[in-house]
Amino acid sequence: MKKTSIAIIFLFMGLQLAAQTKYLRSIAETQELSKDVVSLFKENNIAASFEQLTPYWPMPQNELDAIEEKTIKYLNIIRDRFGKPIDTLKIKNETIADVALRETYLVRYENTAIRIIFTYYKNDYGWIVNAFKWDDSFTEEFE
């Protein structure tokens, strides 16, 4: 009986996790999500940006929470040191056939910029966030 109960609990947990995952239906939707998240980054509304990403990013919630917390901390430091955000700029769009897409943006501050990279993967159900990264290494974008 215990084994059955445990199996049922894990089944419901698995169903709950699967039910939480949403899929983007097109590249246009991935681009819209990226643009919205970057705009929220510029406004320093990190909590809202993660709320936008989370339904499409199959990652444990505790890991997402940790990334969000660190992002809030470091973006506040960037704003204090390098001034207010000025604007955003999409700088690159890369694809691997019809299965992967990477979009790169800059959020420009008064005295520096941060780079935001979204990687999307297309599975049988649609597009998901495969990776999301931001850093201050925008100079790596020079060719």
Identify the function of each model-found stretch.
Residues 18-43:
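Short, low-complexity N-terminal intrinsically disordered segments enriched in polar/charged residues
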Residues 92-143:
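Exposed beta-sheet edge and beta->alpha loop/turn motif
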Residues 17-18, 60:
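A short hydrophobic/aromatic micro-motif that marks alpha-helical segments and, especially, helix-coil
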